[in-house]
């Protein structure tokens, strides 16, 4: 009886947090211009204030919002999901950003936010700490639950920010923005997804093999492969250094099993990581095959990162690897040039990076469903990729009549995993910028007459628009 009463109480509290329409509407009705934006947000049930950081021309708030652990059974527990608000004006459009990982608590602005000169809501992905339910029921970490998190936060904030909304994100964040539109297609007026991989069939990854056969020039590809092999030929010497470094820095290898296994993963990432974060012009930095072990060690650490497969490096990203091994899929690349020097064939797959007490079963079909929706039913979708980014090997595909639905896919020439609209060729840059402005409802008359006139509405801000160093020290989108 006591347990039932607690469950009923929890359900009633959550229903109050969800707002059942009336509570949110009541909070939103306080729309007097003089009302403080923080006070207006805090009147929404489930909102908590964490901190505010000053930034000229904006209000920047760090908040949490109470979410159900399971959106299908909202009475079965809640957790606090962290998000930030870069507030400009309620009369401006709002961009909903997510990285698909943790949220930064320092003021920043995504490219679409600068283009439309709007507000930005940035949300932390569920299960990335501190936005993790306790205890953690990992079966509730899937793309629908995460999309439903975004949907609820959007519903809570829409009465305050009533103008048009766009969704955006890069890499896993671009995937997240796409999944959000698939499950809640009417929430956003448009979506800008950057460098978002689309692993429709996890067992068929030949597109990546083709990519690595053609990326950059032949000399660079050949030298990278040679150095990758040499790193494994000198394995024993380098692993001894690796173990010494780990001991001195308190790093352990319980999840992957040993420093030797971790090292093989690090080396397997080497070529992928080079193209993910570097350019053809950086090929001159690739050491000679006969380089000293010191040079080789430094190059491997600079490109792949020795910390990535330690327990401490993996822990933060357990939610990603769980998703990769249950729904998202993960790339598998053939490495014929490494024949005879691999000790653990097949080790570089998601199950290797998730603690064994967390059960994982791959559920095929989730990515194929999203892929079908994008090709057949999506509208107002913009996908931006980098020509030399490995994750572009399996991009989202546009179906028949894409242009009529205002769906676009552009590639930044020579671009890597940091590619954006600004790096597109002139005509595509103008088209993409014009579409974003139109979706947001703020396209100037000049742009409506001639899309070539399209440019960001907000001036560049060196701090707010700085290029983030989101480099992952392991193979992650």
From Swiss-Prot:
SUPFAM superfamilies per UniProt:
alpha/beta-Hydrolases (SSF53474)
Tell me if Hydrolase is a UniProt keyword of this record.
Answer: yes
Q: Propeptide per record: which residue ranges?
A: 28-33
Extract the Pfam families matched here: Peptidase_S37
Temperature effect, per record, is:
Optimum temperature is 45 degrees Celsius.
Record flagged with keyword Mitochondrion:
no
Q: What residue range is the signal peptide? A: 1-27
Residue ranges, annotated region (Disordered): 448-477
Subcellular location, record wording? Secreted; Cell surface
Checking InterPro entries in the record gives:
AB_hydrolase_fold (IPR029058), Peptidase_S37 (IPR008761)
The Swiss-Prot or TrEMBL record annotates one GO molecular function as: dipeptidyl-peptidase activity
Keywords on record: Aminopeptidase, Hydrolase, Protease, Secreted, Signal
Single biological process term from Gene Ontology: proteolysis
* One GO location term (cellular component): extracellular region
* EC number of this enzyme: 3.4.11.-
Q: Which family does it belong to?
A: Belongs to the peptidase S37 family.
Summary of the function given for this chain in its UniProt record: Has proline-specific tripeptidyl aminopeptidase and tetrapeptidyl aminopeptidase activity. Activity is highest against tripeptides containing an Ala-Pro motif. Involved in the final processing of transglutaminase, by removing either the tetrapeptide Phe-Arg-Ala-Pro left after TAMEP or SAM-P45 hydrolysis, or the tripeptide Arg-Ala-Pro left after SGMP II hydrolysis in a single step.
This protein's name: Prolyl tri/tetrapeptidyl aminopeptidase
User: Taxonomic classification, please?
Assistant: Bacteria, Bacillati, Actinomycetota, Actinomycetes, Kitasatosporales
What gene name is given for the protein in this entry? ptp
């Amino acid at each position: 009886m006591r347990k039932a009463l607690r469950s009923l109480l929890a359900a009633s509290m959550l229903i109050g947090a969800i707002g059942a329409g009336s509570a949110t509407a009541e909070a939103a009705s306080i729309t007097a211009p003089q009302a403080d934006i923080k006070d207006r947000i805090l009147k929404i049930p489930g909102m908590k204030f964490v901190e505010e950081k000053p930034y000229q021309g904006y209000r920047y708030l760090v908040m949490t919002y109470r979410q159900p652990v399971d959106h299908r059974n909202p009475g079965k527990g809640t957790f606090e999901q962290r998000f930030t608000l870069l507030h400009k004006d309620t009369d401006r459009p709002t961009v909903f950003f997510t990285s698909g990982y943790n949220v930064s608590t320092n003021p920043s602005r995504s490219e679409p936010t600068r283009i439309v000169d709007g507000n930005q809501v940035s949300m932390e992905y569920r299960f990335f700490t501190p936005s993790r339910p306790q205890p953690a029921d990992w079966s509730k970490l899937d793309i629908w639950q995460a999309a439903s998190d975004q949907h609820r936060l959007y519903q809570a904030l829409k009465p305050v920010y009533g103008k048009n909304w766009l969704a955006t994100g890069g890499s896993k964040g671009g995937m997240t923005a796409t999944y959000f539109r698939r499950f809640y297609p009417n929430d956003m007026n448009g979506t800008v997804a950057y460098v978002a991989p689309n692993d429709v069939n996890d067992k068929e990854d030949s597109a990546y093999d083709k990519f690595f056969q053609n990326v950059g020039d032949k000399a660079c590809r050949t030298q990278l492969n040679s150095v990758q092999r040499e790193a494994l030929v000198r394995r024993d010497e380098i692993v001894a250094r690796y173990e010494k470094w780990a001991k001195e820095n308190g790093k352990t290898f319980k999840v992957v099993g040993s420093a030797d296994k971790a090292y093989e993963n690090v080396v397997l990432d080497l070529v992928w990581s080079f193209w993910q974060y570097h350019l053809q012009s950086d090929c001159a930095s690739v050491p000679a095959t006969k380089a000293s072990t010191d040079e080789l060690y430094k190059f491997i650490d600079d490109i792949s990162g020795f910390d990535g497969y330690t327990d401490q490096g993996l822990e933060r990203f357990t939610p990603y690897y769980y998703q990769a091994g249950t729904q998202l899929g993960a790339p598998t690349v053939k490495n014929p040039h490494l024949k005879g020097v691999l000790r653990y064939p097949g080790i570089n797959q998601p199950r290797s990076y998730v603690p064994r007490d967390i059960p994982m079963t791959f559920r095929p079909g989730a990515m194929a469903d999203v892929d079908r929706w994008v090709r057949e039913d999506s509208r107002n979708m913009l996908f931006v990729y980098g020509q030399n980014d490995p994750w572009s090997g399996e991009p989202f595909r546009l179906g028949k009549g894409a242009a009529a639905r205002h769906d676009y896919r552009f590639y930044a020439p020579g671009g890597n995993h940091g590619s954006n609209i600004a790096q597109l060729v002139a005509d595509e840059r103008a088209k993409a910028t014009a579409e974003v402005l139109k979706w947001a409802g703020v396209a100037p008359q000049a742009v409506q007459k001639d899309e070539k006139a399209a440019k960001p509405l907000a001036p560049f801000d060196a701090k707010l628009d700085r290029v983030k160093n989101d480099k992952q020290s392991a193979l992650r989108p």
